[in-house]
């Protein structure tokens, strides 16, 4: 079975639950007292998707303003980006649009974008309507899902949908399946003055 490494970065404001989503996906656990990410953290998880193994190389970025300049370093070369907002905080959804704009300007052109409305278990204090977020995601051709890292809602489904959207290696083989050979340049005879 073929193994594909897929770099995925999580972007979004501080406190939206990026680290909790990663922990739920990788470790199937939830820590309500998780510390804010400083810079970025890295975790991996391998899952089977159809006839391939997908090894997700997950970069969980810090959401604080002082770390925003580092974000391009993490999404450069990514197969996918998950932009997370908190359904109970309207401002995190507004800021999400800035993350999308930055990603479109500086990220890989073929990056798969997913929007995750986290904390969907807190519907009684919801500020972002699911329909509004879904409409926005559709307008930018992004995956949309509401998640709850706390209650393990739609976390695995999010990564399955990312696997589904990433073009298969069979569908688009590099160079039409043809490679090229490197050849050594013939060396010229050395000249000497004596």
From Swiss-Prot:
Residues 185-194 have a biased composition (Basic and acidic residues). It is a lipid-anchor. Its main location: membrane. PROSITE patterns: RAB. It holds the Pfam family Ras. The keyword Ribosomal protein does not apply. The keyword Nucleotide-binding applies. It is found in: Endosome membrane; Cell membrane; Early endosome; Late endosome. Detected in brain and heart, and at lower levels in lung and spleen. GTP binds at residues 12-20, 60-64, 118-121, 148-150. A lipid is attached at residues 193-194 (S-geranylgeranyl cysteine). Belongs to the small GTPase superfamily. Rab family. Plays a role in endocytosis and intracellular protein transport. Mediates trafficking of TF from early endosomes to recycling endosomes. Required for NGF-mediated endocytosis of NTRK1, and subsequent neurite outgrowth. Binds GTP and GDP and has low GTPase activity. Alternates between a GTP-bound active form and a GDP-bound inactive form. Binds EEA1. Interacts (in its GTP-bound form) with RINL. Interacts directly with ZFYVE20. Interacts (in its GTP-bound form) with RABGEF1. This is Ras-related protein Rab-22A. It comes from Mus musculus. The gene is Rab22a.
């Amino acid at each position: 079975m073929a193994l594909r490494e897929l770099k995925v970065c999580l972007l979004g404001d501080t406190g939206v639950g990026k680290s909790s989503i990663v922990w739920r996906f990788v470790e199937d656990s939830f820590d309500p007292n998780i510390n804010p990410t400083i810079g970025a953290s890295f975790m991996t998880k391998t899952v089977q998707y159809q006839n391939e193994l997908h090894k997700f190389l997950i970069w969980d970025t810090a959401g604080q303003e002082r770390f925003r300049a580092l974000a391009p370093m993490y999404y450069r070369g990514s197969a996918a980006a998950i932009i997370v907002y908190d359904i109970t905080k309207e401002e995190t959804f507004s800021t999400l649009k800035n993350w999308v704009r930055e990603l479109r300007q500086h990220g890989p052109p073929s990056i798969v974008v997913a929007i995750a409305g986290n904390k969907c278990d807190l519907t009684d204090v919801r500020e972002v309507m699911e329909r509004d977020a879904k409409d926005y995601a559709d307008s930018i051709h992004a995956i949309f899902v509401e998640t709850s890292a706390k209650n393990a809602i739609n976390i695995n489904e999010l990564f399955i949908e990312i696997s589904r959207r990433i073009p298969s290696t069979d569908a688009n083989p590099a160079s039409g399946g043809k490679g090229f050979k490197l050849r050594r340049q013939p060396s010229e005879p050395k000249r000497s003055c004596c």
